[in-house]
């Protein structure tokens, strides 16, 4: 089974892990409802950039 020949230095380990961190989500205020939403995503009511792009779905459980 392969084993490392040398100990990995802290700086090399840190460079490898540099992309593992979590970044905060980009959040904006929705123009139509005033609620928070992720930027560059369609809101729950179907609006994107002030325009309706999706038609709203009916209430859950209605037949």
From Swiss-Prot:
The keyword Ribonucleoprotein applies. Residues 1-26 are annotated as: Disordered. One of its GO terms (molecular function) is structural constituent of ribosome. Keywords: Ribonucleoprotein, Ribosomal protein. InterPro entries: Ribosomal_bL32 (IPR002677), Ribosomal_bL32_bact (IPR044957), Ribosomal_zn-bd (IPR011332). One of its GO terms (cellular component) is large ribosomal subunit. GO terms for biological process: translation. The keyword Secreted does not apply. Residues 1-18 have a biased composition (Basic residues). It holds the Pfam family Ribosomal_L32p. Belongs to the bacterial ribosomal protein bL32 family. This is Large ribosomal subunit protein bL32. It comes from Neorickettsia sennetsu (strain ATCC VR-367 / Miyayama) (Ehrlichia sennetsu).
């Amino acid at each position: 089974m392969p084993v490392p020949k040398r100990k990995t230095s802290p700086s090399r380990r840190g460079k490898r892990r540099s992309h593992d961190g979590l970044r905060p989500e980009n959040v904006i205020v929705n123009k139509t409802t005033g609620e928070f939403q992720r930027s560059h995503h369609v809101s729950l009511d179907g609006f994107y950039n002030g325009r309706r792009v999706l038609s709203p779905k009916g209430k859950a459980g209605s037949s």
